[in-house]
Design a protein with these regions (language model features):
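Positively charged n-region of N-terminal signal peptides that target proteins for export
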Residues: 1-4
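GH16 jelly-roll
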Residues: 23-310
Length: 310
């Protein structure tokens, strides 16, 4: 009798163990985008989600896909419209985010930012074209282009890496109309967020050519970056010759960290109010937007580097 009870107990435990394992959730395999170009000429996107939703009943819609550009006849665009009632901070205004992950590859977009200098020269607003993903183990993966719209001659490029409370930044600030590199720096929270100059191989090219008449608000420009495991290259296409002008060819590392993200990410573009980050040339430019300013996006593209994404 004892043998029978012992046998049945073992069978029960075995079945319970199998059942428990069956109920365990299998890890979800992340999905990655293949190469694509989104022209935003349809009501919905195959590649991007609209964060924050759309208000079709409102006269001040955040997102208007497939509408005509105000500055370039015959070009259909995605229009972002900021709401003056939006609170400050990234992600509080219109934003699109890729449905799946992206990784090492070539990214580019054709964008025109709003022209506000005659209307509100001290406005504090940011257009961000970037990648972003925070993971517990590897930390942040962010590569960005940013424009503080109070001065459309200036661009900000760089990365954020590191974990929560230990973030790390490399960045370059450039006046493309004048060909001036205002700064090329790195900093980290572990070091008190003090800016340190990047020199030598981390500061290439040391100078950039001026693009005559450059004004990110007056017309569309094509901006891009190429992301490799050991290198990042930010570039712009010359509006007349379509020559690729390299603005920063970053290789290697800072004394404290690499500065090059090494984990998967998402692909985004957003428009938001800042109350504490003025543009380099105007310390007063942190005002809340007074009007529903608009960003025009012609297209966004992604081409993965298959040899690195294995």
């Amino acid at each position: 009798m004892k043998r029978i009870v012992f046998f049945l107990l073992n069978v029960f435990l075995l079945l319970f163990s199998v059942s428990a394992k069956a109920k365990e959730k299998k890890p979800v395999k992340p999905k990655f985008h293949k190469a694509f170009t989104e022209h935003f000429n349809k009501d919905s996107s195959k590649f991007f989600n609209l964060n924050g939703g759309r208000k079709r009943e409102s006269k001040q819609m955040r997102y208007v896909p497939g509408t005509q550009s105000l500055c370039e006849k015959g070009t259909d665009i995605m229009l972002f419209r900021i709401d003056p009632k939006d609170p400050f901070g990234p992600g509080r205004g219109p934003e699109i985010c890729s449905k799946d992950y992206t990784y090492y590859g070539s990214y580019s977009a054709r964008i025109r930012i709003p022209d506000v200098r005659e209307v509100q020269p001290n406005v504090g607003a940011v257009v961000g074209y970037f990648t972003y993903n925070m993971e517990k183990e590897k930390g942040l993966s962010e590569i960005d282009w940013e424009w503080l719209i109070a001065d459309p001659e200036i661009v900000y490029i760089g990365t954020w890496t590191g974990k929560h409370n230990a973030l790390q930044r490399i960045g370059r600030t450039i006046n493309l109309a004048k060909g001036i590199v205002y700064e090329c720096i790195y900093r980290s929270e572990a070091d008190g967020n003090k800016n340190h100059k990047l020199t030598g191989l981390q500061n290439q090219p040391e100078t950039v050519p001026a693009i005559k008449g450059f004004n990110a608000a007056s017309q569309f420009y094509t901006y891009g970056f190429d992301w490799y495991p050991d290198r990042l290259v930010w570039w712009i296409l010359h509006p007349e010759t379509e020559e690729k002008i390299v603005l920063w060819d970053y290789k290697g590392s800072t004394p404290l960290f690499s500065g090059i993200p090494d984990n998967k990410t998402r692909y985004l573009l957003n428009f938001w109010h800042t109350n504490n980050w003025p543009v380099h040339t105007n310390p007063k430019s942190v005002e809340k937007p007074k009007y529903p300013y608009e960003v025009e996006i012609d297209w966004m593209s992604y081409k993965p580097f298959k040899e690195y994404n294995k």
